[in-house]
Amino acid sequence: HIAELANKNKLYTTYIGLGWYNTITPAVIQRNVFENPVWYTSYTPYQTEVSQGRLEALMNFQTAVCDLTAMPLANCSLLAEATAAAEAVSMMYAIRSRAQQKANANVVFVDENIFPQTLAVMTTRAVPQGIELRVGKYKDFEPSPEVFACVLQYPNSNGNAEDYSEFTEKAHAADCKVAVAADILSLALLTPPGEWGADIVFGTTQRLGTPMFYGGPSAAFFATRDEYKRNMPGRIIGWSKDKYGKLCYRMALQTREQHIKREKATSNICTAQALLATMAGFYAVYHGQEGITTIASRIHSITVFLEKQLKKCGYTQVNAQYFDTLRFELPEHVSAQQIRTIALSKEINLRYYENGDVGFSIDETTDVAAANVLLSIFAIAAGKDYQKVDDIPEKSNIDKALKRTTPFLTHEVFSKYHTETEMMRYIKRLDRKD
């Protein structure tokens, strides 16, 4: 019956973006983790002595998050990017300076180009805490005594990768913490927020091999500075020594957690997306730095190619710097409805803006054939000729100031298991430890 219902759905290719992207789940991870009851039925690893495999897998996830964000500490996942944003606001409220607490500083500045679903959840969670969200342009932000924190999106909801380094300095000078919602795959190419002063970096790892399902779930990530570790939501996996002096994994700093502290807790989060975080960690292990950089570069190259071709058709692209998302102002003789009609006839969903602009986000599954179809939609709408291509050369359009220069995924675990057989044996070795 469920299959019958599912078959009624029309399967279109979606390029809407906004935090959700098609991705390729490596078959070795799908078979040996996602479809394996050893991994999908396991409960919270309270008994560390019978949970070493799961704990190591989650440590891989934390390490990957720390490396990609350039932050010193990460937890082993939260429920979703939007709830991670709400947790970031609650955490920054808890770590206000004494002067801010005395002055009852209760305002968070939020850049207007944050994902709408993230803003909605932050608003829902802020109201009962007495926190006011002030939404505006980050370039117009002026610090004031009542503002204790700022939240930014990187790249923003239009796809523009802004240079927030000056903004962050300005905020810190006014004793404001800065939280950044980041696209984790873009951080393979873009300067990570940890390098330009972010206090908290959060987001989703959905595009690290987690299918979209019915719009969720996927594991959120949350990273912060070491000095804020006791206020961090979620679970943290750490190292310890057993009674024989042997190194082992266990859940660290548990006394700060809500299920132990209860009324004194700064977070009500006592749970995680352990299975999907495990999968994202294995995705990083399987691909390593080189593989993830190749995936990110291919996505960016296709985006650069499409921008160039659509400009030839008379479209104006508004993002100065981007990773995978383009937003176009249309020529006078072209309407968004024309584009929508052509796109739907080709079973494609694009993003349509309220002001009439049209955009799309490229992902890991986009190939040359898909790029040709996207090009054809805009060319036909504009009445222009277009040439199909057989290959798209690697090209970067990222400014030097925004380009990542530091290595990531440098731990040996990320360079040892790059074939299906090696990966399968590693996963099996870990599940035997549980």
Go through each PLM region and give its residues:
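Active-site C-terminal subdomain of aminotransferase-like
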Residues: 208-309, 313, 318-320
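N-terminal entrance/gating region of PLP-dependent enzymes' catalytic architecture
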Residues: 1-60, 66, 260-261, 400-434
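Gly-rich Lys/Arg/Thr-decorated short loops/hinges at beta-loop-alpha junctions or inter-strand turns
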Residues: 36-48, 66-71, 102-105, 133, ...
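Noncatalytic alpha-helical scaffolds and linker/capping helices
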Residues: 342, 351-377
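Conserved PLP-enzyme active-site core in the AAT-like
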Residues: 83-248, 310, 327-328, 341, ...
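Conserved PLP-binding catalytic core of the aspartate aminotransferase-like
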Residues: 313-342, 362-366
